[in-house]
Amino acid sequence: AVXHPGTXVSXAAXXXFIPL
């Protein structure tokens, strides 16, 4: 989740922590 590009977006989309 950290250092991954789009962490904030993934967290908002999945409501959790999805490092994609």
UniProtKB/Swiss-Prot annotation:
One record GO biological process: hydrogen peroxide catabolic process
Gene Ontology cellular component annotations, sorted alphabetically: extracellular region
GO molecular function terms noted in the UniProt entry: manganese peroxidase activity; metal ion binding
EC number(s) per entry: 1.11.1.13
Coiled coil regions, renumbered to chain: none
Compartments in which it is found: Secreted
SS bond list: none
Reactions that this protein is recorded to catalyse: 2 Mn(2+) + H2O2 + 2 H(+) = 2 Mn(3+) + 2 H2O
Keywords: Hydrogen peroxide, Iron, Lignin degradation, Manganese, Metal-binding, Oxidoreductase, Peroxidase, Secreted
Function: Catalyzes the oxidation of Mn(2+) to Mn(3+). The latter, acting as a diffusible redox mediator, is capable of oxidizing a variety of lignin compounds.
Entry similarity comment: Belongs to the peroxidase family. Ligninase subfamily.
Protein name: Manganese peroxidase H5
Protein source organism: Phanerodontia chrysosporium (White-rot fungus)
